[in-house]
Amino acid sequence: MKAVILYTMKGCPFCTMIKEELEKSNIDFLERDIDEYEEEYDEFAKITENEFIPAFLLVTIDEDNNSKDVKLYAPERDFQDIYEGVELVKEYLK
């Protein structure tokens, strides 16, 4: 199973736009507000060396519920606009 986690922040227009695009594409995702999941996001930002949002954590989970493959996608590092970000997610979910 593959899971999509989207890091967002209240009041972020790009976060709202990317959520709308994911929903239009019928992509299920788990939203994590960085104010509520600060430690988790700080670790993500440290690994990606990027603190911009919206950002993605894409996880493949095996039959024992263990993370088998983790991909991190951060804006400006891995994608330049929300549409490119959504395309990365679509490609991952194929």
Where do the model's predicted regions map?
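Thioredoxin-like thiol-disulfide oxidoreductase module
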Residues: 33-52, 60-62, 86-93
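Loop/helix-junction capping segments adjacent to catalytic residues or to phosphate/diphosphate-binding pockets
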Residues: 15, 38, 83
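Short beta->alpha junction loops/turns
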Residues: 11, 34-37, 78
